[in-house]
């Protein structure tokens, strides 16, 4: 069974950092996540990506990857799986204003994923509160799976 994470973004909302509390350069608190085959396949079904690299062991074994992998977009699931319920990124009303990702190696079933994340900058534009943030996902061997920079508009 895949590890569960809190999907009620309103729960403990008052405990999260608000705009004034976010310090550029300060690391965000993160938690390791064991990526299971079940989680990969549930994610793939949810987004409609049924490629055999994610479902068919025999097919995947013959591929250049030598086994089942997760799709590159799995970082979306990992972002929330690797952050605790009180992380400011989970604040209700947060808007994704854009992102740019680089993919190095695929995540695999059984990988223990860790996230290094921090706010890089914050600014106000047209009365909106923006945060630029940096995220790097690693597997249990310290290899970078993917890294990215995102822009969010904060609710407060």
Where do the protein language model's features map onto the residues?
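HotDog/MaoC-like acyl-thioester-processing domains
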Residues: 1-20, 103-156
